[in-house]
């Protein structure tokens, strides 16, 4: 899975590519051709509670 700064071209690589937001990150997933998977961003840091 590649880490990219921009997902604009990544979502246009294949007609089955979808943009999904999970845990504060943006993912491009492609079930028919998994080599097009990529991610953008970092998750927000978790707040430690006592």
Swiss-Prot record:
InterPro entries: Ribosomal_bL36, Ribosomal_bL36_sp, Ribosomal_L36_bact. GO terms for cellular component: ribonucleoprotein complex; ribosome. Keywords: Ribonucleoprotein, Ribosomal protein. GO terms for molecular function: structural constituent of ribosome. GO terms for biological process: translation. PANTHER family: 50S RIBOSOMAL PROTEIN L36 2, LARGE RIBOSOMAL SUBUNIT PROTEIN BL36B. NCBIfam families: PRK00831.1 (NF002021), rpmJ_bact (TIGR01022). Belongs to the bacterial ribosomal protein bL36 family. This is Large ribosomal subunit protein bL36B. It comes from Pseudomonas aeruginosa (strain ATCC 15692 / DSM 22644 / CIP 104116 / JCM 14847 / LMG 12228 / 1C / PRS 101 / PAO1).
């Amino acid at each position: 899975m590649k880490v990219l700064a921009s997902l604009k071209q990544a979502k246009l690589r294949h007609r089955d590519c979808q943009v999904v937001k999970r845990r504060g990150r943006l993912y491009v997933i492609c079930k028919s051709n998994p080599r097009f998977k990529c991610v953008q961003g970092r998750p927000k840091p978790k707040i430690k509670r006592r």
